[in-house]
From Swiss-Prot:
The gene is menH. InterPro entries: AB_hydrolase_1, AB_hydrolase_fold, SHCHC_synthase_MenH. Its EC number is 4.2.99.20. This is 2-succinyl-6-hydroxy-2,4-cyclohexadiene-1-carboxylate synthase. It comes from Escherichia fergusonii (strain ATCC 35469 / DSM 13698 / CCUG 18766 / IAM 14443 / JCM 21226 / LMG 7866 / NBRC 102419 / NCTC 12128 / CDC 0568-73). One of its GO terms (molecular function) is 2-succinyl-6-hydroxy-2,4-cyclohexadiene-1-carboxylate synthase activity. It is an enzyme of class 4 (lyase).
Length: 252
């Protein structure tokens, strides 16, 4: 079994760019940014429980990273960058820390490296279980209306929230809930030590208005790019800023 993905081919000899979306997104999420790099072959992946991979269920991060590896092999992708937002960034960091032959580097946008205390994990597990129950039992429009009121999305205006609620409400609530629990921060290892000892290139993108993830970025041994005029979802709020950072990283 492999993950559903959309492949776009560029010039031979350059590494692939493998894009991983955030929670409740899909393979289209990164395409405005990715299509600015047409010289590179691009793979836009649907993570389990999402988009064309909605029917794929997993029990944890190891299942997700295993599926990602199989997917890359199936496309004969032997030289690549992982580019991930939020959940996709966490998957990218996990996969890279476990080891991926052919990995050039990881570019993470607003991805959490992991909680550091049992108390934080317990709090997060309770919170994610409550959200998962809502995703399973309530209309998605109602759930996402509340979801986008969370502090991490404080930089969004009312129109941006309405647009995201409408877009995300096309998902399957049950499969989102399952993926939320399987990849909760409560069950993710703290990756800080692994990332400090890494052998791959590591870049971190965060929005100028995203104080939480700017603080997290400062804890990581990563080259950090702060994207102006953006909050947590920088590639949506300022795609041109993210394109500029990726171009600098890739020396495009």
């Amino acid at each position: 079994m492999i993950l559903h993905a959309q492949a776009k081919h560029g010039k031979p000899g350059l590494p692939w760019l493998v894009f991983l979306h955030g929670f409740s997104g899909d393979c289209h999420e990164w395409q405005e940014v990715g299509e600015a790099f047409a010289d590179y072959s691009r793979l836009y992946v649907d993570l389990p429980g999402h988009g064309g991979s909605a029917a794929i269920s997993v029990d944890g991060f190891d299942d997700v990273t295993g599926l990602l590896r199989k997917t890359l092999v199936s496309y004969n992708i032997l030289n690549f960058w992982l580019v991930g937002y939020s959940l996709g960034g966490r998957v990218a960091m996990m996969a890279a820390c476990q080891g991926m032959p052919g990995l050039c580097g990881v570019i993470v946008e607003g991805g959490h490296p992991g909680l550091q205390s049992a108390e934080q994990r317990a709090e997060r597990q309770l919170s994610d279980r409550q959200w998962a129950q809502r995703f399973r039992s309530e209309p998605l429009t109602a759930v996402f209306t509340d979801w986008y009121q969370q502090p991490v999305f404080a930089s969004l205006n009312d129109d941006q929230r309405r647009e995201l609620v409408a877009l995300r409400s096309n998902n399957n609530g049950a499969t989102l809930a399952a993926m939320l629990e399987a990849t909760s921060l409560a069950v993710q290892p703290d990756l800080r030590a692994n990332l400090s000892a890494r052998t791959f290139a590591f870049y971190y993108l965060c929005g100028e208005r995203d104080s939480k993830f700017r603080a997290l970025a400062a804890e990581l041994a990563a080259d950090c790019h702060v994207i102006p005029r953006a909050g947590h979802n920088t590639h949506r709020e300022n795609p041109a800023g993210v394109i500029a950072s990726l171009a600098q990283i890739l020396r495009f």
